[in-house]
């Protein structure tokens, strides 16, 4: 336990939530103004830089407020800002797994690039609420639904193997057994309807496959939050610092995804590296009670698989150009 006091005053929470709401509103306005579109690397870089800048400004404001308060002082201010940045960087690092799974989910369901922005926008907003609940309620909720990790781990492994073996032909979503389980709970149509999550068929309101993708995005973030949130609690037990560092890091997930997605389109064999990563993550979840795989090893496997697939792609495409 830290010797420093918690700093989650109503004022601090108010400033934090106001900053988040303003940024979310700006994101929503941008989507409404530009409509469904493919996010390019310049736009992704701009949003990534903006989120990092806002996070740094918040940390700077927090330091000034704490250092100028006689109850806390400079020592507490320095410690809390250090905890914030440590938690922020840790969450950003662990988010690598999320990004690759997002790529896998979009690839598996063959979601058009111009609709991915909308899915991730709502997916990230949902993730904020879910992560806040997990942070404040604690590990009890995670233990109660621990079986979800095994279920989704099996799904990830199955999807990774299937993607590695699949061709580029259109896939019949209605024939997928795993999706059939979800469809028994939520009526899901077999065809996409632009960027709509719901549509009307035969006089009944049903979900589109895009809504199913949104559900998978939400579930994947919840699963990986089981790793990342306890990791941040190892840095600090102050719920305000855990919440703020986690949320600011997650808000940049969408922009990070499009940075990687734009690169992925340029490498012909990258999908095999991503499929391997997906399978590895699935196995990691399935074996978590018997084999503990450190995050450092997980990231090494991720970057190793991606590096190998990218290098192979570069060699292959260079040979094609030279012919």
Model-identified regions with their sequence ranges:
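Multi-pass alpha-helical transmembrane bundle typical of ion/small-solute transporters
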Residues: 1-323
């Amino acid at each position: 336990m830290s010797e420093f006091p918690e700093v989650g005053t109503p004022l601090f929470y108010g400033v934090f939530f106001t900053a988040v709401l303003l940024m979310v509103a700006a994101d929503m306005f941008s989507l409404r103004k530009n409509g469904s579109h493919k996010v390019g690397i310049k736009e992704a870089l701009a949003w990534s830089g903006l989120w990092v800048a806002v996070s740094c400004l918040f940390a700077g404001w927090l330091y000034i407020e704490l250092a100028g308060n006689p109850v806390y002082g400079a020592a507490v201010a320095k410690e809390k800002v250090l905890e914030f940045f440590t938690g922020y960087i840790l969450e950003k690092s662990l988010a690598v797994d999320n990004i690759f799974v997002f790529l896998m989910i979009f690839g598996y369901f063959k979601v058009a690039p111009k609709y991915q922005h909308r899915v991730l926008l709502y997916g990230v907003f949902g993730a904020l609420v879910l992560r806040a609940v997990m942070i404040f309620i604690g590990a009890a909720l995670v233990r109660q639904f621990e079986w979800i990790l095994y279920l989704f781990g099996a799904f990830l492994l199955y999807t990774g193997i299937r993607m590695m073996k699949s061709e580029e032909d259109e896939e019949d979503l209605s024939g997928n057994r795993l999706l059939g389980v979800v469809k028994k709970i939520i009526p899901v149509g077999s065809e996409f309807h632009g960027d709509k999550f719901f549509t009307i068929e035969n006089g009944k309101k049903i979900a589109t496959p895009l809504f199913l993708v949104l559900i998978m995005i939400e579930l994947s973030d919840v699963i990986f939050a089981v790793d990342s949130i306890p990791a941040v609690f190892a840095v600090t037990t102050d719920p305000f610092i855990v919440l703020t560092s986690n949320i600011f890091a997650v808000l940049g997930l969408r922009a990070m995804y499009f940075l990687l997605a734009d690169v992925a389109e340029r490498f012909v064999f990258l999908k095999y590296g991503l499929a391997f990563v997906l399978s590895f993550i699935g196995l990691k979840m399935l074996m978590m009670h018997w084999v503990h795989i450190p995050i450092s090893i997980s990231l090494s496997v991720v970057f190793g698989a991606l590096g190998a697939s990218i290098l192979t792609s570069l060699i292959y495409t260079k040979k094609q150009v030279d012919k």
